[in-house]
Amino acid sequence: NYWLCDNRFVYQENKPYPHIVFEDFLPLDIANLISNEYPNLNAETEHYKVRNHEYVDRYFLEDTTKFTTSIQLFSNAVNSRSFLLFLETLTGIKSLLPDPYFMGGGAMITKQGGHLNIHVDFNWNQKLQLWRRCNVLFYLTQNWKEEYKGNLELWSKDGKKKVQDIIPLFNRVVIFNTTSTSYHGQPSPTLCPKDVMRHVFSAFY
């Protein structure tokens, strides 16, 4: 598969650490379905965990039983054998395993003014007793505009300098290695209208 081989090279060579950005990653009908059925913050706030302090302001939902059937099937797909084999070939990391609990991941929502300071994710998954190696982010807000800000930023390995700035456009996917130096975040508060929210589904491996 020349496409995958080419992208594996791109992944390994990208700075500040191995990562890649894919456009129109999911079939459009599936991306639209997931976006339209994304857990509603107003109706299901009681299911979301809330992080709201100086470092982060966002909602996240790890419990897949609270998802619609379509999003449950999607969450199963991102943990499937075929997707794991794709990730292993792309990243060069062998024997990847999914996190079926979506600890620190799952469905995430950032409202107007929300942010996430530059950080590194915890690398040790206590529940699975395994090291995290890779993170996949699926951006799922239809008609997201550049002026809404809320970009994903990848910073240098010493955490002192921004290197990449990625707009969370609809059906864009970002994959990157999870290490003790993979600094990233969304430090710029979202400027979206109150009726628009930044949706991202996060999976760790």
Language model features with spans:
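Non-heme Fe(II)/2-oxoglutarate
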Residues: 4, 8-91
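A structural signal for short, well-ordered beta-strand segments and their strand-loop junctions
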Residues: 21, 97-100, 106, 175-176, ...
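Conserved strand-loop elements at the edges of beta-sheets that form or border functional pockets
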Residues: 24, 109, 168
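A structural signal for well-ordered alpha-helical scaffolds and beta->alpha junctions
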Residues: 27, 71, 80-84, 88, ...
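Non-heme Fe(II) oxygenase catalytic core, chiefly the N-lobe of the double-stranded beta-helix
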Residues: 36-39, 66, 75-132
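Proline-centered turn/helix-capping motifs that create local helix->coil transitions or kinks
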Residues: 42-44, 94-97, 142-146
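Catalytic core of Fe(II)/2-oxoglutarate
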Residues: 113, 121-134, 141-205
